[in-house]
Structures are given as C-alpha cells and as structure tokens.
Amino acid sequence: MKTLHKFTTLAIATVLTLSLTGHSLAATAHFTDLDHIQGKDQIEALYNKGFIKGIRDHEFQPNATITSAQGVQMIVNSFQLSLAAIDFNVAPQASDLFTKVHDDAWYTDAFIIAILNGVNLSADIDPAHKLTREEFTSYVIHALEKDSNLPLIRINPVDITDGTDLNTHYSGTIQIAVALGITTLDDKGYFHPKEEISRADAAVMTYNALEYLKAHPRQS
C-alpha cells in the first residue's frame, strides 16, 4: 500500500475549478473512506459519472495500490473505450491476446477493449500486478490519444530529476503527461516512476486526462 504524495496536491490544483459535469466538483459523497484524501472530489466525480467503483459499496480504499485489472477497467470505463468501431470475423478472446488474462474473468472485456484501442498492454500482463506510476501514466496517455490530437501536439521536454529511471518505452508518454498537467512532479522534480501508484492517484490522473480531453477535443 502506498500513501499519497505531495505531487497529488499539485495535480489537483490544476483542475479544481473544472468539473466533469459542468457544475461544482462537490457532490453527495458516496465513499466513506475519503475524508482526509487529496483528490476526494475527483474520485467522487468519476464515481458519479459511473466510471469507477469502490472495493466495496462505500469503500474506495484510496491508499491501496491499484492492480492492472482495476487500472485497465478504470481507463476503459472513463474514456468510454469500446469495440463498436472495429469489425471482426471472429470475436477476439483474451487468450488470443494475453497469456495471463482469463477468458471469463470480470476484467476480461476491459483488457480486450483496451489493447484493441491502442493502450500499450504487454501480452504477458498479469491482472493482479500492482501498477507503477510510469505504467499507469502510459496507459492513460495512450487512451487519451484515441480521442485527442496528442500526436499533433509539439511537447517541449520537461526536466525530470529521475528521468534516467524511466523505462524507455514509457518516457515519451510521461513527458506528455507532465507537460499537459495530467500528472506532476514532486517539489524536487522527481516523478518516482517505479513506485506503485495508489487508487486515489490513479483516479486523479484519470480525472485530469478527461478534463484535458474536454478542454481540447479532437479537431476534425
């Protein structure tokens, strides 16, 4: 389990005046374990849109590390990814695409939908794997690219203090996420790429990405 970092506060500050609903972020609280959590309003906003669920009915477990299954499901739901625009001769099975994703699990459809919509999931991804900050950030940016003009945006590289620790497969998407304010560095410029990401931090990052998409829709 991981506690929230102070960079979460910075990320939240960039979007406090925005809302997924067009109204105030404040809404009737559903979860009972968010009282002292940075990102409480963002989590509740995602819940009220039907994008995320708790571990139990009124329990989000914000400080728990998010698993691959939970993270992929959050991204698919939040970005409303689907297979509607893809034609298949035969419907794909998880076992055709992954080695560790079962064909009949609660998360099965999310993994299939995510990878076929361009989210860079590895074939050997383990649904129980605890996601790191760099992994989840990369997944979010790939989902965001589906409905935005990100490939056309010129990004000025950001100086990341622990940039040499980044997996080269994720460094580009992390640069985008930091540059666009979807995630932030801590006050010393560290990203902490290998650190496990909490469910609260993952939700805040997802919220920020949706707010960016709302403010910068794809241009025809």
Residue ranges and their predicted role:
Residues K2-K40, K53-A69, V76-W106, L116-E134, ...:
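Feature responds to low-complexity, polar/acidic, surface-exposed segments characteristic
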